[in-house]
């Protein structure tokens, strides 16, 4: 089982793989899970939660223990609704990670705290949110996942969305590379 356990401020890890059913059960209740890819790809792991469980505590956990960039994979249509464009017109990233322009919700101050990043992510899921509700640039990194998900691109972005779908959750996640 590949789970991170935090008890009394002490982090311990158990390095066996979980079943998909165990991962989905954890995701359904907002627990972070780790997804690792193949040695022939990035050979790394990402902490993942379903975006609807983005809380100050979960974002802080990701920043503290994974230490990578906190990203939010979402549907292209959702990001287009908010007028959030691709970060670059020609993507030359080795793995073609589809970054968009970063955002903060207008009700945040600096946008960088775990609480404000969680708030921005929650607002990205809000069906009543409008383009003017988001400032650019910001501290939340939306990503566009490929339609067809892991059958088309074997990235953490797409794997996180597949897990959200299988868990019956919204098609949006929060991922953070473990560095």
Per-segment meaning from a language model:
Residues 12-179:
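Catalytic domains of riboflavin
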Residues 1-12:
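Short, Lys/Arg-enriched N-terminal segments with co-localized hydrophobic residues
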